[in-house]
């Protein structure tokens, strides 16, 4: 479980990350199973990173969606300390996610996080 201070809760926060990932400063990258959106903001400098999950009904029924959220939450809770302060991350599950071994998801998540954080960091200077 992610601590409350590390969770995105408001829909406006989710929208800002998803919008920001397409614009200046933000970044997104995806695999067959997940898409990771990152939006570092100066307004949140010095505050802990926050994470949000988006798992739509296209992924499966409620049982499947909740399991997907539990797995993604557990993977992110062990990686939250690696994220820089002031960064908001949204992980969007794709329809191929159910049934994917956790080890593969962990590998994809690590690779995608490294990619989007590197891109977001290089765009901040511009």
Give each language-model segment a name:
Residues 1-64, 74-77, 81-85, 94-126:
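Contiguous, often N-terminal, cationic amphipathic patches that form binding interfaces
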């Amino acid at each position: 479980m992610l601590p409350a201070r590390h969770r995105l809760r408001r829909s406006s926060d989710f929208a800002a990350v998803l919008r920001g990932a397409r614009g200046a400063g933000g970044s997104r990258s995806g695999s067959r199973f997940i898409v990771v959106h990152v939006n570092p903001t100066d307004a949140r400098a010095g505050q802990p990173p926050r994470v949000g999950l988006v798992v739509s009904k296209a992924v499966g029924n409620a049982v499947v969606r909740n399991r997907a959220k539990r797995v993604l939450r557990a993977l992110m809770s062990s990686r939250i300390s690696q994220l820089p302060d002031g960064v908001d991350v949204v992980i969007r599950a794709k329809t191929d996610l159910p049934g994917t071994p956790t080890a593969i998801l962990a590998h994809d998540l690590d690779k995608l996080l490294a990619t989007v954080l590197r891109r977001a960091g290089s765009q901040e200077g511009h």
